């Protein structure tokens, strides 16, 4: 494999045996692609904004004289970039302008001649844009729109599994679900009548729907039944015989023909009998007259002389009727063919309970059910029914729905109209009846072929369409009002409803969520999340067990491991690594095609629907050099997802990768295959809660997924183009782009500004640190700067800790951990947390609030950290209760007398009419002020601090641009210099001239002169561009801010807190092995090995066997081996050994095992080998891919190479006594994470605080500065001990005895320690409650 310069700095050795066939795809595709489809112009108008516009426009007025047509749309450029929007608290959005055409026609002209056309661009609100990382910035905060897994539109056949009716009878039902519009359900009741429901309302006999579709009784029976015809001949009754229909029946009379008895009476009819009848070609058989009694007529029989109906369709035939029919001259009588087994009389029975008799009565019934209480008219009833399923405005199956509908009914063509047709409804009823008759299967709702993904773009389009529909109504009204001479499209359209609908979706939809920004992994996972909840989805209370369960079709599409614990389990899932959505929104996963037992290079994506037809081999099947299966039988997933053994020639496809099944977070767990699923789930979830540490440390034992996650998360800076590093400092990297990658006529310089110490959504710290050095060559797509939790472009969520599995004095009881003080000293788990506190000055009724340092009744000490504007200075160390921003609010309770007004006017006594409402540091918080921002409303005078900040920003912006210009100029003048030197000038001449004069020289060579003139033009362009950019920056910085109504000024203060690890903090490994730190032990007390090296963490060995997460033990062993090799390399470097020896040793380590990754160090220069060795000193990074990891023998070999015992166990000594422990202990390196559950955020103690209004008891919870609840059971405990006085104190003065507690407070302050409890307030409450019941209750004093 060829490594680039940066990749050679540190190579992760992989134990993966299978070569990588398909690279891990870009992980945020699902978000970015979906949104791109939404905003790009789709020429077919099938999706996105274009589709929404085309579905609503043209809007025609009610009289048809005018129409508003849609021409095209365009999105503007956002005013502020993403970073500026976050700082200012605005939405990152672009304005939408739509070109509309208002056409008016002549009233009298029948042909519709056009009278007038007005075309105009209309503003239609703002559309939030997606950032390059798949997020949205809404009101300054980053949000993610989670994709939804919802039931695909189409038709579904289901049964109640015998749960509805007490008899346990299985009732079948069918449901037609459109993308938008009314649902239509068909269902059987326990009496086997077929009913229909519209929108889950009251049920109606299903035949009402058929009658409303204009079918007569005769046509209905014709659609659903086969006929049996009887002939009356010579007073005999002959029945046309279809032998196949007789199977399984019992003959109720002798079946004979031509004098031969084929079947005797009372005998069961078998296949042998049928064969005999078919052989002799018997087509008619004589039946006794009684046989026809009870059969049902298939059509109306009319008396031809009188026109009177003798026997209507669907009537049971009796002997009298038969007599009448034969008298009327009917020789042939048709009846319905039914039997109890597989041709039930359901529709015929339903027609009997159907109250309607023709189309109109059916429509009236439907109208009454949909609009109870309204008087039906013929027009209204027809209009309602047509609009329900046959109007494209109200009903749309969508392309997906039509495809699923046709597939379900076995129709070849998967395209068609978005509305239903008569045939569609009849076909659904037919299939439902077939299923009831035992032919066909019900659908599996949880199959991923019946559930589809609805992503951001689609949801945004739906919201946008809702907004457009609201506008459409208003436009229609306006068009109908007449007087359209002076009206322009701009006057007709109000953008408010549109922007309100879009804003509502992005701001408050259940699926638009505050981004989880703990670390890069949590960001990536959040964007790849798939939720079954949300509008149009399930609710967690109603979701049963089946929906939440892992389904066979999840394989390679949805991760079976990663899902939250708790009420949402199984409803929120994560996309598998390689999964993607197809055009219809169904999840697909890639497979390698197999032809005749030979695996090809071809890769195909299959959806769950297609996958069911094939046999698919697993990724770990053994292949030979020619990619043929070596085993006679291969474990595969066959039809319907059942696994079994198949011959190689029966196999159609093979998995692409062993990681195909799991999601990104689960693919980061090494030795996942050795962990119990429940613990793996916790491990995957807890990695998302890891807080980025001060110094990121790559995992010694990884899985190879660390790099793609870090790159795709967007937290690191990636090179846009290759080149050389020209300048680097903590906040900026400049790259001189390679000649072949520059565009003609540009300077070829890329400047990357880094993000420094900013706050994430979870209050963790986002900071980028350069990881390249001056002069280094880089390639496109390489990492230039590490973000939070990344180390040399690899995800690094925690730290590698030396752990020992052994009990230690009970300090690791029940998952606690004993941590060495060295971990604290080295700041291994120190994290930075940044909090934003804001102070808002509003305009109140009594006057405006003011931000000032002049605060009434506050001592000098409290103001010591404020500047003259009343705002805290940067760098101040503050603690709970300190003032950050001084603010006073006018108070105006008192009406002043004229005398007082005069005095106040003379002496300017101001303190009395304002109250202090300053922003203070919340209790329990302390930290350093790292940044202050002041936002002032347009037209309000800026204070001194705001001007200072503005000045600083202008300086910084100018400095940035000047530096950029200098770098670009240097590049340009370098080219000018080369040109002049080649054109006859020498160095000395050029040095005597000013650089700008170089451009004025003339060269003899015409070609070179032209080049020089071009460069001079470029120089001018650069200067102009610089001025222009500076002006834009300046206007952005100087302009007032767009604040909420009534807000004059906002001051935001950022506090940074450095949190070291301490007892009570929660830590975890990657295998679901979580615990709380019980004690931080001095280094000298920790167990140490014979080299005197102490361990960092002592874990409890009893936490492993019962939890069955053995992966952590294997990780520990492999980590020890990795460290051992690092130690060996370190020793060789320290001894200054020969580079060749070093190269040999490292090569040996990379070659160990039979992995597919080959590292050839012979192509590395000595310098590169040394750099690599230096980076491997702390341990050699290893990768053990999921389900394809290191084997035990490889771990042992690696331990041996590192000069360590192959058992992975070491003799330890007690740090306090120096004695040996009685048996060897498993010691190694485990990757530990510090989770965002810090004791500082949870611990809390109340002094005197606020009380609840009604009960007067202290509030609860840290946020309310509440107390600890002394509940019912605690009271019982004190009662049991007979601690009467303690109990009395608890129930009165410490709780809700108002007078008692004030008295007590005074006593304590006064130094007298006595209490006299009074009546608790809650006693008064109960008295009031009893009085409210009308019972008078009084307390009599004795």
Swiss-Prot record:
GO molecular function, one term: DNA binding
Keyword hit for Transferase: yes
GO cellular component, one term: DNA-directed RNA polymerase complex
UniProt-listed InterPro entries: DNA-dir_RNA_pol_bsu_ext_1_sf, DNA-dir_RNA_pol_bsu_external_1, DNA-dir_RNA_pol_su2, DNA-dir_RNAP_su2_dom, DNA-dir_RNAP_su2_hyb_sf, RNA_pol_bsu_bac, RNA_pol_bsu_CS, RNA_pol_bsu_protrusion
Single GO biological process annotation from the record: DNA-templated transcription
Top enzyme category: transferase
UniProtKB keywords: DNA-directed RNA polymerase, Nucleotidyltransferase, Transcription, Transferase
Keyword field contains Cell inner membrane: no
EC identifiers of the protein: 2.7.7.6
Top-level taxon of the source organism: Bacteria
Catalyses which reaction(s): RNA(n) + a ribonucleoside 5'-triphosphate = RNA(n+1) + diphosphate
Cross-referenced HAMAP family: RNApol_bact_RpoB (MF_01321)
Known role: DNA-dependent RNA polymerase catalyzes the transcription of DNA into RNA using the four ribonucleoside triphosphates as substrates.
Stated family: Belongs to the RNA polymerase beta chain family.
Quaternary structure and partners: The RNAP catalytic core consists of 2 alpha, 1 beta, 1 beta' and 1 omega subunit. When a sigma factor is associated with the core the holoenzyme is formed, which can initiate transcription.
Name of the protein this chain belongs to: DNA-directed RNA polymerase subunit beta
């Amino acid at each position: 494999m060829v490594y680039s310069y940066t990749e050679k700095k540190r190579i992760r050795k992989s134990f993966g045996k299978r070569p990588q066939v398909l690279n891990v795809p870009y992980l945020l595709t699902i978000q970015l692609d979906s949104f791109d489809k939404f905003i790009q112009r789709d020429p077919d108008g099938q999706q996105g904004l274009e589709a929404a516009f085309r579905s609503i426009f043209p809007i025609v007025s009610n009289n048809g004289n005018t129409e508003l047509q849609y021409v095209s749309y365009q999105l503007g450029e956002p005013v502020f970039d993403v970073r500026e929007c976050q700082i200012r608290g605005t939405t990152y959005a672009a304005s939408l302008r739509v070109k509309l055409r208002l056409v008016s026609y002549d009233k009298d002209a029948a042909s519709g001649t056009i009278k007038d056309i007005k075309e105009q661009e209309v503003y239609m609100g703002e559309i939030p844009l997606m950032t390059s990382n798949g997020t949205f910035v809404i009101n300054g905060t980053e949000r993610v729109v989670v994709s939804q897994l919802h039931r695909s539109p189409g038709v579904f056949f289901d049964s109640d599994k015998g749960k509805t009716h007490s008899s346990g009878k299985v009732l079948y039902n069918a449901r037609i679900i459109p993308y938008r519009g009314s649902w239509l359900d068909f269902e059987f009741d326990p009496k086997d009548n077929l009913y229909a429901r519209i929108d889950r309302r009251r049920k109606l006999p299903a035949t009402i729907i058929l009658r409303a579709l204009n079918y007569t009784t005769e046509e209905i029976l014709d659609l659903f039944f086969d006929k049996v015809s009887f002939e009356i001949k010579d007073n005999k009754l002959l029945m046309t015989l279809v032998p196949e229909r007789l199977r399984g029946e019992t003959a109720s009379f002798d079946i004979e023909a031509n004098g031969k008895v084929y079947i005797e009476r009372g005998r069961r009819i078998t296949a042998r009998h049928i064969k005999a009848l078919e052989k002799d070609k018997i087509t008619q058989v004589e039946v006794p007259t009684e046989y026809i009694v009870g059969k049902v007529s298939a059509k109306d029989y009319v008396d031809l002389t009188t026109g009177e109906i003798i026997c209507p369709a669907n009537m049971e035939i009796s002997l009298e009727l038969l007599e009448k029919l034969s008298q009327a001259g009917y020789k042939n009588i048709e009846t319905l063919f039914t039997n109890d087994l597989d041709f039930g009389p359901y529709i015929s029975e339903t027609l009997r309970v159907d109250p309607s008799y023709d189309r109109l009565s059916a429509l009236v019934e439907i109208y009454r059910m949909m609009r109870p209480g309204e008087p039906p008219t013929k027009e209204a009833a027809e209009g309602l029914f047509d609009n329900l399923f046959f109007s494209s405005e109200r009903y749309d199956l969508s392309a997906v729905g039509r495809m699923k509908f046709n597939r379900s009914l076995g129709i070849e063509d998967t395209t068609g109209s978005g509305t239903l047709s008569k045939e569609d409804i009849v076909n659904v009823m037919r299939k439902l009846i077939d299923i009831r008759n035992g032919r066909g299967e019900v659908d599996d709702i949880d199959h991923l072929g019946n559930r589809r993904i609805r992503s951001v773009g689609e949801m945004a389009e739906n919201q946008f369409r809702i907004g457009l529909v609201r506008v459409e109504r208003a436009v229609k009204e306006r068009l109908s009002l007449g007087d359209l001479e002076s009206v322009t499209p701009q006057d007709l359209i109000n953008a408010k409803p549109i922007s309100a609908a879009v804003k509502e979706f992005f701001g408050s939809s259940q699926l638009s969520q505050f981004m989880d920004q703990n670390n890069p992994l949590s960001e990536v996972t959040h964007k790849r999340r798939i939720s079954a909840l949300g509008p149009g989805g399930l609710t967690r209370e109603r979701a049963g067990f089946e929906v939440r369960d892992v389904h066979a079709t999840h394989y390679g599409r949805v991760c079976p491991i990663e899902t939250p614990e708790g009420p949402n389990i199984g409803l929120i899932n994560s996309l598998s690594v390689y999964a993607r959505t197809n055009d219809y929104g169904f999840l697909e996963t890639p497979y390698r095609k197999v032809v005749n037992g030979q695996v090809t290079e071809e890769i195909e994506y299959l959806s769950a629907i297609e996958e069911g037809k094939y046999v698919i081999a697993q990724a770990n099947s053994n292949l030979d050099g020619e990619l043929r299966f070596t085993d006679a039988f291969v474990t595969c997933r066959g039809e319907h997802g059942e696994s079994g053994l198949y011959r190689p020639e029966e196999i159609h496809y093979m998995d692409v990768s062993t990681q195909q099944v799991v999601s990104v977070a689960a693919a980061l767990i090494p030795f996942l295959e050795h962990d119990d699923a429940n613990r793996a789930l916790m491990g995957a979830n807890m990695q998302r809660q890891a807080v980025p540490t001060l110094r990121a440390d790559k995992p010694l034992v990884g899985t190879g997924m660390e790099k793609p996650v870090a790159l795709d998360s967007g937290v690191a800076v990636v090179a846009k183009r290759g080149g050389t590093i020209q300048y680097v400092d903590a906040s900026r990297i400049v790259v001189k782009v390679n000649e072949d990658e520059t565009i003609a006529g540009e300077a070829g310089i890329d400047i990357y500004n880094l993000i420094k110490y900013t706050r994430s959504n979870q209050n963790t710290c986002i900071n980028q640190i350069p990881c390249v050095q001056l002069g280094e060559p880089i390639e496109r797509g390489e990492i230039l700067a590490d973000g939070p939790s990344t180390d040399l472009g690899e995800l690094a969520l925690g730290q590698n800790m030396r752990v020992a599995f052994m009990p230690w004095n009970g300090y690791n009881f029940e998952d606690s951990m004993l941590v060495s003080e060295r971990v604290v000293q080295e700041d291994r788990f120190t994290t930075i947390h940044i909090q934003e506190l804001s102070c808002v000055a509003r305009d109140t009724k009594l006057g405006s609030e003011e931000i000032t340092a002049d605060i009434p009744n506050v001592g000098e000490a409290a103001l010591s950290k404020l500047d003259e504007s009343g705002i805290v200075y940067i760098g101040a160390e503050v603690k709970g209760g300190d003032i950050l921003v001084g603010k006073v609010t006018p108070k105006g309770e008192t009406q002043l007398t004229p005398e007082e007004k005069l005095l106040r006017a003379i002496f300017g006594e101001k303190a009395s009419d304002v109250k202090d409402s300053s922003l203070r540091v919340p209790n329990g918080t302390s930290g350093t002020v790292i940044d202050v921002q002041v936002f002032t409303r347009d037209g309000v005078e800026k204070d001194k601090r705001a001007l200072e900040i503005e000045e600083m920003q202008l300086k910084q912006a100018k400095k940035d641009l000047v530096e950029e210009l200098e770098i670009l100029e240097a590049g340009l003048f370098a080219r000018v210099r080369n040109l002049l030197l080649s054109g006859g000038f020498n160095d000395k001449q050029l040095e005597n001239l000013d650089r700008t004069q170089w451009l004025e020289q003339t060269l003899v060579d015409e070609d070179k002169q032209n080049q020089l003139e071009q460069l001079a033009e470029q120089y001018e362009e650069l200067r102009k561009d610089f001025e222009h950019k500076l002006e834009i920056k300046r206007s952005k910085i100087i302009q007032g801010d767009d604040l909420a109504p009534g807000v004059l000024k906002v001051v935001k203060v950022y506090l940074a807190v450095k949190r070291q690890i301490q007892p009570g903090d929660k830590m975890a490994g990657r295998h679901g092995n979580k615990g709380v730190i019980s004690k931080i032990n001095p280094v000298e007390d920790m167990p140490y090995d014979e080299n005197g090296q102490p361990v960092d963490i002592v874990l409890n060995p009893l936490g492993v066997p019962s939890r069955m997460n053995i992966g952590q033990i294997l990780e520990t062993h492999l980590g020890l081996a990795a460290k051992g090799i690092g130690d060996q390399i370190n020793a060789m470097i320290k001894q200054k050994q020969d580079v060749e020896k070093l190269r040999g040793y490292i090569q040996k380590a990379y070659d160990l095992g039979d992995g597919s990754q080959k590292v050839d160090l012979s192509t590395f220069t000595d310098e590169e080998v040394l750099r690599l060795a230096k980076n491997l000193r702390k341990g050699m990074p290893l990768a053990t891919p999921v389900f394809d990891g290191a084997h035990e023998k490889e771990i042992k070999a690696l331990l041996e190479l590192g000069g360590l015992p192959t058992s992975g166990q070491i003799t330890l000594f007690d740090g306090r006594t120096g004695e040996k422990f009685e048996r060897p202990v498993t010691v190694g390196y485990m990757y530990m994470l510090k989770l965002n559950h810090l004791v500082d955020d949870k611990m809390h103690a109340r002094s005197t605080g606020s009380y609840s209004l009604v009960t007067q008891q202290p509030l609860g919870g840290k946020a309310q500065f509440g107390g600890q609840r002394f509940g019912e059971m605690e009271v019982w405990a004190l009662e049991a001990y007979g601690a009467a006085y303690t109990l009395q104190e608890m129930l009165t003065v410490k709780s809700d005895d108002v007078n008692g507690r004030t008295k007590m407070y005074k006593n304590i302050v006064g130094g007298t320690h006595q209490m006299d409890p009074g009546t608790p307030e809650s006693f008064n409450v109960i008295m009031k409650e009893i009085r409210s019941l009308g019972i008078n209750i009084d307390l009599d004093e004795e």
